Amino acid sequence: MTEEFNESMINDIKEGDKVTGEVQQVEDKQVVVHINGGKFNGIIPISQLSTHHIDSPSEVVKEGDEVEAYVTKVEFDEENETGAYILSRRQLETEKSYSYLQEKLDNNEIIEAKVTEVVKGGLVVDVGQRGFVPASLISTDFIEDFSVFDGQTIRIKVEELDPENNRVILSRKAVEQEENDAKKDQLLQSLNEGDVIDGKVARLTQFGAFIDIGGVDGLVHVSELSHEHVQTPEEVVSIGQDVKVKIKSIDRDTERISLSIKDTLPTPFENIKGQFHENDVIEGVVVRLANFGAFVEIAPGVQGLVHISEIAHKHIGTPGEVLEPGQQVNVKILGIDEENERVSLSIKATLPNEDVVESDPSTTKAYLENEEEDNPTIGDMIGDKLKNLKL
């Protein structure tokens, strides 16, 4: 055989060429391929058949299959005038996979892949080659046991590609975050001030409780937890508790939502409707003194005013002459204004007096109708509560 003929036999196909052929024989550790246009058969070692680990070539090919591969080496035996092309199907699959993944990365697209293995540091997935989802990129939530993903097909995004080091990093967390953001935006657009909705207590702080209302957290300030004075949120709610809340305000730009639990609850006054009536004599506790009278709590959260003229039969200059906060007293209900939630009381009417003088109806009428010049303001009525309130 001449040197020219030998060169013609081996130079038609060279290393790096991409070739196609038909599988002629499947052996234990390799596959024999008839190369289209080639002078020799091709050999694909088992390690170069797939990007995945296989125990037998028959797992991925069979006789008669058409395959495509790169030529990694041309072997020629001059003495016997025989040769073979050493091929890599794996190299071609990897190249195609990187090209596909690069396109998805450039376009920020979501792909689906099956989890083939769960390891200590994350998830191994099949993306045409071995891809890895690190533990930190699996979810926006804490997941204690990654084995729940074993065998599942998950939605992921390409985070990083490094072909030189055969490195493919993927993120399931990025997909979750994108979906959560879309849900949050949709929810924010659907909410309106005044809506009463269900929520769950997510976390507590010194100044209030954050409520999960379906993917978005809103704040219930400590002053909006109850009609009664609350020192700390833990007195009223606990993490994980289901609650009803009313939307007080929404700032869609900053995604800040102000909520109220108090506004969904009956007021203390509503709770006592039908319990008290005019002319009833009941017990109460003096909670605050003002220059025009004394505020007496007759039920939890319900206070009535004893005008200074209704404190004693004798003339007094200030309520403090005969009363002090915390003092228990008997009071007579002079009037109830349900619409404005006001109660007019009298201590004098419960006290014996030789010269009994009927309570002045004009005093009661003025308080209930808010006509007296020195009638208490909202600040007068809840001043102590505001002083004690920790913001």
Curated annotation (Swiss-Prot):
<feature type="domain" description="S1 motif 3">
    <location>
        <begin position="194"/>
        <end position="262"/>
    </location>
</feature>
<dbReference type="InterPro" id="IPR035104">
    <property type="entry name" value="Ribosomal_protein_S1-like"/>
</dbReference>
<dbReference type="GO" id="GO:0022627">
    <property type="term" value="C:cytosolic small ribosomal subunit"/>
</dbReference>
<dbReference type="InterPro" id="IPR003029">
    <property type="entry name" value="S1_domain"/>
</dbReference>
<feature type="domain" description="S1 motif 4">
    <location>
        <begin position="279"/>
        <end position="348"/>
    </location>
</feature>
<comment type="similarity">
    <text>Belongs to the bacterial ribosomal protein bS1 family.</text>
</comment>
<feature type="domain" description="S1 motif 1">
    <location>
        <begin position="16"/>
        <end position="90"/>
    </location>
</feature>
<keyword id="KW-0687">Ribonucleoprotein</keyword>
<dbReference type="Pfam" id="PF00575">
    <property type="entry name" value="S1"/>
</dbReference>
<dbReference type="GO" id="GO:0003735">
    <property type="term" value="F:structural constituent of ribosome"/>
</dbReference>
<feature type="domain" description="S1 motif 2">
    <location>
        <begin position="108"/>
        <end position="173"/>
    </location>
</feature>
<keyword id="KW-0677">Repeat</keyword>
<dbReference type="InterPro" id="IPR012340">
    <property type="entry name" value="NA-bd_OB-fold"/>
</dbReference>
<keyword id="KW-0689">Ribosomal protein</keyword>
<comment type="function">
    <text>Binds mRNA; thus facilitating recognition of the initiation point. It is needed to translate mRNA with a short Shine-Dalgarno (SD) purine-rich sequence.</text>
</comment>
<dbReference type="GO" id="GO:0006412">
    <property type="term" value="P:translation"/>
</dbReference>
<dbReference type="GO" id="GO:0003729">
    <property type="term" value="F:mRNA binding"/>
</dbReference>
<dbReference type="InterPro" id="IPR050437">
    <property type="entry name" value="Ribos_protein_bS1-like"/>
</dbReference>
<keyword id="KW-0694">RNA-binding</keyword>
<protein>
    <recommendedName>
        <fullName>Small ribosomal subunit protein bS1</fullName>
    </recommendedName>
</protein>
